Amino acid sequence: IITGVITRVEGKNVFIDLGKTEAILPPTEQIATETYREGDRIKCYIVEVKKTTKGPQIMISRTHPGLLKRLFELEVPEIFEGVVELKSVAREPGMRSKIAVYSRDENVDPVGACVGPKGQRVQHIVDELHDEKIDIVKWDEDPAIYIANSLSPAKVISVDVSEEEKSSYVVVPDYQLSLAIGKAGQNARLAAKLTNWKIDIKSETQ
């Protein structure tokens, strides 16, 4: 992860000064909801370094899941120290993300550590990503529990899993159905991406 200052915008490419060198933020790695202005200081994730005749060309990203992962490592000492492990990240950049965390120490609440006192740790990351919503869920080796957690903030009644097909059937209370699915299916889509399971959601009366 690097911090730099935007020096110029040429066409759709944003150029960032890293001190001794310059990096390129191409349109494919930009967050659609962000505006990039000359003089702005931003954090980015290094995707690759290309060798060119003019020297190394550094390609950076604001959309890469690795950016979110590194921001949590910088903000949460428990992750940096290895007490809390970040198991999975799913992102729809600029909109919403989900991260799954696990604690190696039963006395440390992994979700609480990431949220921080008065929500300050996660808020710093949300601010850096210009109000991208972040759901922090507890990872579990039991897929049914993990899937139920991944659909947070929705409450789940039951989860049936098929290990062979890596698919699940989730029942939620009627009043929680739209929350579980999310706007334009976003919550369910991110939960499936986070857990790597197919998730079929139905309400209690369906």
Where do the model's predicted regions map?
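RNA-contacting regions in translation and RNA-metabolism proteins
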Residues: 1-206
